[in-house]
Amino acid sequence: MSYFIVFILLIISIYKFDIRNEIRFKKVYFYCILILLIAISAFSYRIGSDTIHYMEEFAERKMQYEYFIINAERQPGWLLLVSLFKLFPHPYYVFKFFFSCFVNTVFLQTIKENTKYVFSAILMYFIFIYFTINFEILREALAVAFFLLSLKFLYKRNFMTYYMLLFCSIMFHVSALCLLFVPLFYLMPQKRSFFYGLLLFIMLGILFDEQLRFLIYHIFYVDIFSEKALYYFEKENFGMTKKNIGIINYFLNLFLPIFMLSCANKQNKLPKYWLCVCAYCIIYGVSIVLPIFFRFNNYFNIFYIFIFIDFISGVNFKKRLSLNSMRLIFVIGLTLFVSFKLKTHFSLIDGKNPSYVRYYPYSSIFDKTRNTKREQVFRYLNN
């Protein structure tokens, strides 16, 4: 019911504020949705496949120095944060409340600052990103949040402040190292030829996948990465998946975002987040060869939402189409995309339980209900 309330409220908000362009009560709706998203995350109980691990980590009553030694593979920022919240009674729940407030506020504020169609973007965030960020990758979610805080400095090319906040990201998750290279896109010409050249470069990487795999393997086979690299590269389920990627996924995740950037550039309306969309496409291309790299797009998925929303909203067609036609395209495009992406929640995760059982039905800390199917998935994923 809690998910349904958020969904209905977002549909109403999209109609009122994104389609009809109403202003009255817009802030009220925005903050009501934010509070609901925070509450759902903060008061959740055993939701998400990594939840048990985090709950156990906070439950360990080790002395601080023992905790640091036992969990030496964790990043320092996370270790310090966990140690701090262990000073409170029920540390995990106190932490989760802080986490939910911080991460969801940062995400929604980023949405507000980067697209005109705020509630459409929040709907896509809720469906495609929210559950992973709030119930799965808590450490990486904090790293993503610090990256999003650095965006306004990146846009202004204030690289000193950008890298200071990036350091905070790395303190929570080593995957944030991929953000070191994002400013390099400013060295590239902002021309259509660059965007199509980028697409060609990615496709060549996919075509010569064995050579790319060999190169990346040896880049990551250094002391600070070797253990994790071996773990991910040698597991069968992280192996080659190029043949399993459908033509629709190629189109949606490679051709479409670059085409949308090209169209925006042609009209001199290249969005300020264009370099993050380019990073998204490169990482998606690499992840076709090495699927584990797909997790790096946790930093950039939100920008795909921005470019998609801005594109189908009619920005690129407004000189040729009527207002009602633009609205129709917007609704149809949003509906088709959401419908296609939603199918991932219905795929079987352990051969018998659909993926959505990790999050539905909802269970709160007030009733502490354990869902049988969810517990089966927990055991399957954590064995």
Where are these regions (language model features)?
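Alpha-helical transmembrane segments and terminal signal-anchor/GPI-anchor hydrophobic tails
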Residues: 47, 52-56, 62-63, 79, ...
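Loop-to-helix entry region of an early transmembrane alpha helix in multi-pass inner-membrane enzymes
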Residues: 76, 88-105
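Membrane-interface transmembrane helices that cradle and orient dolichyl/undecaprenyl
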Residues: 147-161
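Signature aromatic-anchored transmembrane alpha helix within multi-pass, membrane-resident enzymes
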Residues: 317-339
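Short hydrophobic/aromatic helix or loop-helix immediately within or flanking a transmembrane segment
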Residues: 52-60, 67-90
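Transmembrane-helix signature of polytopic, membrane-embedded enzymes
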Residues: 108-128
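Short acidic/glycine- and proline-prone juxtamembrane loop motifs at membrane-interface regions
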Residues: 135-141
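Membrane-interface alpha helices of multi-pass inner-membrane proteins
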Residues: 130, 161-185, 201, 281-285
